[in-house]
């Protein structure tokens, strides 16, 4: 018999047989859930609950407690909606995994990458079920992560069958990369597009109605285009079919890249999943999901990959000592990432507490990664955006990043925030520690605040960078503008220099090895009080422009030092106070209509090779080696008339 029905909401007085309170039962009528209270629930029982909840479109809600799933990971390939409330700890891995490509049949092999190198056309195995002329795909085996050593950690290849038997398959084209334990499969739907699909297009011409429907996610795998980072051909993207008829596909978001002769392949992403509630999870992997939502949970380790339209926010990750604590890879569409605290990553190679790899269009706000540790010669950073996951060079195109606060990592490499391969991005409000911008194109980086640290800028093309740092290093770079306030000088190769410019390595868009920077504008305010300070030390730059924003202080040792290979430097009127290296290449600011100098000897003199020149009150032109204190100083001379 149930009593006290008027107890406050959430009361534990009056409990049903399944452990729910009366209020939970009432709430369940309005928003049906599958309620899990037994912390000793078995893996098979938990799977049965999840299957039934997915069938009915309901949420699996856990009661308070410490759940271990008997030490087993919990993996599903269907939509999973979890409510993990405050006071609940799911102390086991949860994996939601869709299919990168929908397949009909497949054959796994045990060949090593050495036995299946790039260019391979014949693969041993029983492929008698594969029709000649049909499309096949090749991917890494399920039990291997690939390796950058043979340029394949994530590659998929597509071709057609030239011959097949119970002993081998012959591919019509050689594999683009080596594959370890390659799996050969027949995709449910894949066609080769002939021609170019241009970046920013919404429409893919052709009749795809036999295999695709509205809402499907397709993978567009470039073959001959050169729109990857460094002009590479290895890139792909995922798009959602918004409408389709016999004339073609209209996609939900514009193409991020230009593709030439690409494959268009149907994926098997899980349609929607969510994890919310305020509780804690040991490990959550969301892979191959359309429109996943992960909100308001503590996740010791979070991995999101090959997803579309992600919504991830209000996350705290304490880390588990792996190379990254929160990781996003190949997330396409219109995604959101916000309000994330990530820490506790440990690595021996380049990685970070919060890492993103090739996530075009992602909007990122208010993240605070920290407490990262590297035990090797490379760094484990706080925040790292990368664009090379072998073999793919996919631009982080059209990203918006705002409000990243990090700290110096516990490692020999002191970089804390590293951005590589951004194109057409808006980045603002970066602070806390050393910032490194590399290989980015046509992007704006503003409000960088790291006054105690070096700011590194390498191989940027068409970028605008503004902010403050201790000192700055500019290597290469083309058609870019640097509006910087600097408070100190560097050490090592940057010794006593506020801003040093030197040779670059590779143009980010063309991939052409290019050491000479060109057409860069330096608007630098240097406020170092050191008597050894050199404001601008410039080498390996063609047509550098020293802008009107340049300022330094009287205590500086030198304003501009020119090193090797400085071609046609240009100076605009500026406020540098100390020596500037001479050279035959110097050109000045160009004007039309003349320059007006109003005033007299006090404020209208022109300094010319150490001489002050002015027009006296009587109209004569005069000169003096020191600034005149009258219209007729004792050391002045009349030039004429």
Swiss-Prot record:
The keyword S-adenosyl-L-methionine does not apply. GO terms for cellular component: virus tail. Optimum temperature is 20-70 degrees Celsius. Optimum pH is 5-8. Keywords: Degradation of host capsule during virus entry, Degradation of host cell envelope components during virus entry, Host-virus interaction, Viral attachment to host adhesion receptor, Viral attachment to host cell, Viral tail protein, Virion, Virus entry into host cell. It is found in: Virion. Functions as a receptor binding protein (RBP) and probably mediates the attachment to the host capsular exopolysaccharides. Displays a depolymerase activity that specifically degrades some K47-type polysaccharides of Klebsiella pneumoniae capsule, which allows the phage to reach the host cell membrane and bind the entry receptor. This is Depolymerase 1, capsule K47-specific.
């Amino acid at each position: 018999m149930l009593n006290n029905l008027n107890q406050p909401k959430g009361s534990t007085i009056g409990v049903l047989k399944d452990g729910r309170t009366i209020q939970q039962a009432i709430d369940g009528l309005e928003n049906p859930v599958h309620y899990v209270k037994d912390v000793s629930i078995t893996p098979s029982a938990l799977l049965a609950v999840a299957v039934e909840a997915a069938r009915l479109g309901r949420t699996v809600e856990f009661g308070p407690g410490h759940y271990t799933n008997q030490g087993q990971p919990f993996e599903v390939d269907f939509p999973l909606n979890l409510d993990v409330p405050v006071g609940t700890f799911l102390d086991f891995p949860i994996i939601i995994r869709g299919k990168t490509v929908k397949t009909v049949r497949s054959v796994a092999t045990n060949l090593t990458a050495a036995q299946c190198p790039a260019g391979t056309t014949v693969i041993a195995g029983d492929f008698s079920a594969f029709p000649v002329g049909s499309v096949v795909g090749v991917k890494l085996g399920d039990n291997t992560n690939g390796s950058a050593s043979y340029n394949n950690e994530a590659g998929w290849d597509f071709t057609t069958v030239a011959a097949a038997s119970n002993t081998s398959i012959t591919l019509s084209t050689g594999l683009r990369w080596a594959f370890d334990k390659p799996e050969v499969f027949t995709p449910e739907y894949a066609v080769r597009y002939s021609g170019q699909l241009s970046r920013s297009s919404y429409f893919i011409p052709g009749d795809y109605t036999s295999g695709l429907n509205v809402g499907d996610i397709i993978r567009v795998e470039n073959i001959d285009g050169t729109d990857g980072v460094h002009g590479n051909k290895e890139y792909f993207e995922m798009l959602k079919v918004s409408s389709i008829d016999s004339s073609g596909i209209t996609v939900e978001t514009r193409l991020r890249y230009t593709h030439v002769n690409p494959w268009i392949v149907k994926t098997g992403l899980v349609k929607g999943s969510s994890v919310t509630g305020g509780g804690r999870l040991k490990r959550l992997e969301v892979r191959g999901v359309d429109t996943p939502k992960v909100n308001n949970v503590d996740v010791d380790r979070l991995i999101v990959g090959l997803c579309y339209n992600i919504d991830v926010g209000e996350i705290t990750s304490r880390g588990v000592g792996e190379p990254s604590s929160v990781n996003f890879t190949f997330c396409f569409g219109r995604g959101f990432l916000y309000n994330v605290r990530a820490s506790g990553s440990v690595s021996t190679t380049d990685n970070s507490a919060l890492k993103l790899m090739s996530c075009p269009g992602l909007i990122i706000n208010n993240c605070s990664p920290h407490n990262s540790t590297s035990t090797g010669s490379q760094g484990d950073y706080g925040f790292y955006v990368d664009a090379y996951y072998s073999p793919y060079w996919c631009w982080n195109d059209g990203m918006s990043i705002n409000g990243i606060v990090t700290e110096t990592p516990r490692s020999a490499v002191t970089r804390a925030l590293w951005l590589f391969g951004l194109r057409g991005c808006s980045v603002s409000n970066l602070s806390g520690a050393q910032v490194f911008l590399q290989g980015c194109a046509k992007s704006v980086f503003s409000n960088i605040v790291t006054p105690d640290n070096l700011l590194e800028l390498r191989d940027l093309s068409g970028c605008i960078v503004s902010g403050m740092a201790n000192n700055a290093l500019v290597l290469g770079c083309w058609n870019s503008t640097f509006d910087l306030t600097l408070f100190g000088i560097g050490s090592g190769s940057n010794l006593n220099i506020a801003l040093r410019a030197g040779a670059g390595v590779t143009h980010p868009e063309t991939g052409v090895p290019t050491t000479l920077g060109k057409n860069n504008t330096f608007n630098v305010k240097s406020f170092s009080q050191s008597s050894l300070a050199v404001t601008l030390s410039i080498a390996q730059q063609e047509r550098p422009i020293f802008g009107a924003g340049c300022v330094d202080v009287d205590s500086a040792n030198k304003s501009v030092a020119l090193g090797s290979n400085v071609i046609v430097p240009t100076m605009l009127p500026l406020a540098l106070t100390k020596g500037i290296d001479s050279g035959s290449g110097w050109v000045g600011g160009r004007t039309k209509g003349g320059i007006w100098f109003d005033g007299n000897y006090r404020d209208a003199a022109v300094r010319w090779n150490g001489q002050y020149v002015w027009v006296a009150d009587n109209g004569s032109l005069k000169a003096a080696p020191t600034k005149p204190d009258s219209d007729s100083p004792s050391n002045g001379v009349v030039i004429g008339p």
